[in-house]
Each structure stands twice: as C-alpha cells, then as structure tokens.
C-alpha cells in the first residue's frame, strides 16, 4: 500500500520521458517504504529493512535501460532504494533530504523528466558533484569496493571496482568516533589510532582489507 501510494508523487506527478528511466518511479516509491518505517518504528528498523533487500539485487544489467527501444533497466526497486539510502547518508541532514524529495515534486510538478534532470537537481541540493556516483550506480553493474590497509597507525584506502575518476565520501567509525573520508580511485592515507575501522552499513558499498 505504501509503495503504490508513493506513485502519486513519483509516477503521477513526476514521470519519465523514456521507460529506460523507470527507476525514477520505482526507486523512490520503494524507498518510501523505508521512510514509512523510519517514521513509525525508528531509524534502526528502517535501515534493517532497506539493507535487508540487498540480497535480492542481481546487478546483472544497469538500472538505466537502453533509450529509444521501449526497454527498462534492472534492479529498479531494491538497488534503487539502496542508492537513495546511500544518498541520504551523503546528505547527512534529514532536513536537506526531505527538501530534496519534496523539491523534486515541486520543481518537476506534472512534468516528464529524464535521469539527468533528477541527477542535477539532487547534486545541487546536496552540494556535492554526484556525476560519478550516478554513473556508477545507474549505468554500471559493479558495487564500489573500499580497498584499505592499516599499518603503523596509517589508514590507506581507495575505491576499486568502479568507473574512472569515481569519488564518493564515506563515513567510517574509528574507536567509537565517526569520521569522514573522501576516497577516490587513487590511494589516500590518514593517521588513525586503531588497527581496525567500521564502515557505516547504510552505504551500499563493499570493502576489502588488504
């Protein structure tokens, strides 16, 4: 019921020009289920719900389908919801996140849109260039993998299994303290007073310690 009601906003209010961009309908309405749980049962329960859907993501083809041939992409529901959940972590401010969701529906009120319009709107509101983020999650089938090592108090890290020049900030926990790192495809290092880190589970990413 929650999902279908969400289509009053993402489908009946905002719709796509080409079915290849069907994620604009299904990803947002799937994530509305998570927002419902967040409101009624709390953040932890909502996170458990959306993270629990990851086992059903196939990553067999990109979320955006080929244009002009009446074909949609794959994983529009569960991968799309996790894409949006990850974006919410990057925004790190639920007021901004609500403004984005409401703003999409006012900015594109009763319009047909393409993915680029949605991307540009969200990037402008979050204040971070999300070009490679969207290219990775919408147009590639790989999930970003944080490759890292810890030696002599130095954390060295980079993104692998990603498109060229991919960049995305990530929150990690070190000795109970949350800190931001800004990985790219090139190795970076910071000093930490621990031999382990914990990656925020709300990001739809993988990690490997080397």
Briefly describe each language-model feature range.
Residues 28-35, 52, 83-86, 121:
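Generic recognition of well-ordered alpha-helical segments
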């Amino acid at each position: 019921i929650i999902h279908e009601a969400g289509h009053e906003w993402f489908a009946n209010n905002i719709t796509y020009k080409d079915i290849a961009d069907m994620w604009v309908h299904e990803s947002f309405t799937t994530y509305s289920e998570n927002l419902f749980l967040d409101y009624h049962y709390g953040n932890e329960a909502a996170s458990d719900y959306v993270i629990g859907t990851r086992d059903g993501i196939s990553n067999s083809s990109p979320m955006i389908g080929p244009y002009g041939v009446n074909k949609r992409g794959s994983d529009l529901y569960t991968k799309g919801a996790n894409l949006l959940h990850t974006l919410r972590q990057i925004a790190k401010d639920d007021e901004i996140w609500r403004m984005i969701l409401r703003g999409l529906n006012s900015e594109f009120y009763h319009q047909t849109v393409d993915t680029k319009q949605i991307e540009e709107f969200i990037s402008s509101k979050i204040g971070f260039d999300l070009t490679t983020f969207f290219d990775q999650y919408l147009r590639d089938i790989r999930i970003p993998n944080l490759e890292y090592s810890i030696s002599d108090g130095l954390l060295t890290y980079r993104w692998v299994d990603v498109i060229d020049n991919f960049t995305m900030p990530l929150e990690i926990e070190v000795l109970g303290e949350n800190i931001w790192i800004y990985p790219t495809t090139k190795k970076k290092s910071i000093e930490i007073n621990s031999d382990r880190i914990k990656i925020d589970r709300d990001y739809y990413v993988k990690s490997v310690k080397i």
